[in-house]
Amino acid sequence: MIKLSKKYCLGISFVLYILLSVCEGHKNLTCDFNDVYKLEFHPNQQTSVTKLCNLTPNVLEKVTIKCGSDKLNYNLYPPTCFEEVYASRNMMHLKKIKEFVIGSSMFMRRSLTPNKINEVSFRIPPNMMPEKPIYCFCENKKTITINGSNGNPSSKKDIINRGIVEIIIPSLNEKVKGCDFTTSESTIFSKGYSINEISNKSSNNQQDIVCTVKAHANDLIGFKCPSNYSVEPHDCFVSAFNLSGKNENLENKLKLTNIIMDHYNNTFYSRLPSLISDNWKFFCVCSKDNEKKLVFTVEASISSSNTKLASRDNTYQDYISNSSFLTLSSYCAFITFIITSFLSFIL
């Protein structure tokens, strides 16, 4: 029997544990049909091929599709992917994303060739309905010649290498802690206000409309302004007003994550950090000339031990549901580390 030294056993187990732990922390949310799920045709290929890329992101995470380049003449379907999506794998039931998944925002596109989109990205919106899949497709099409047999003439045939993008939109257990200033009953935010109703009822009252939410560690927060209002500060959640009315950089206080600033839809989202060291209040404003200001105020409470444990549990559950293979691998690596460490002392 080969006897391994303590240092060798410890070294191998430690490296394995670190490598798999690092892998667990990396979650790939890209369907890359250029370099990963390749759609190139093989020599003598005579049949179509389909490849599936399945993504299971968390809310507010970004998903990306890479489909074609200046050298790869692929086509993305629908051409307006993420503005429109299919509701099934058979390229049927085309839906507008804002109607199919309420609260959708933040589409990003990149084009390497004229009049053709090669890369699209999309932030997963808060979804209060049961989880649902959405689909886009990347295709590489080729016409081949089929040689005739028994005296029959040759014929032409189209074959398609198709990449299917399946994205599972997760479901939230509770509404986003926030304010929707466009409707009295918001489907996404915990509080809703109809600016028209408020204006009619309080036409003589010039006081601003203040909506306050109390939030804790790891909570989703956000707000929506009417389309004809502007947002102050422009980079809300990167910075915000403190109670003195001074614009302050939130990075120095809270370090919010998953920030979405969608000025096109006037919708802003973010997530509080898992640890809040001090109570903190800040606000952002929806403003319009000669109109009441619509004030979104957040009261972020200091983390208690229970809150910190709860946020850890939530993070743990997210990893289980979205990276189960890697999580299992890290457990195996950890067990390997313990066993190998023990053996190194008895060998």
Curated annotation (Swiss-Prot):
Deletion phenotype: No visible phenotype. Parasites grow at normal rates in vitro.
Pfam families for the chain: s48_45
InterPro entries per record: 6_CYS_dom, 6_CYS_dom_sf, Parasite_Repro/Invasion_Surf
Keywords, sorted A to Z: Cell membrane, Disulfide bond, Glycoprotein, GPI-anchor, Lipoprotein, Malaria, Membrane, Repeat, Signal
BP GO annotations: symbiont entry into host
Propeptide: 323-347
Glycan-modified residues: N28, N147, N200, N228, N242, N265, N322
Lipidation (GPI-anchor amidated asparagine): N322
GO CC, any one term: plasma membrane
Post-translational modification: Processed into a soluble form.
The 6-Cys domain, residue ranges: 27-172, 175-305
Cystine connections: C31-C53, C67-C138, C81-C136, C179-C211, C225-C286, C236-C284
Coiled-coil intervals: none
Alphabetized PROSITE patterns for the sequence: 6_CYS
Signal peptide extent: 1-25
Quaternary context: Heterodimer; heterodimerizes with PF41. May form an antiparallel heterodimer with PF41.
PANTHER family: ANCHORED PROTEIN, PUTATIVE (AFU_ORTHOLOGUE AFUA_4G09600)-RELATED (PTHR38796:SF1), PTHR38796
Miscellaneous comment as given in the Swiss-Prot or TrEMBL entry: Does not have erythrocyte-receptor-binding ability.
Protein name as annotated: Merozoite surface protein P12
Gene this chain is encoded by: PF12
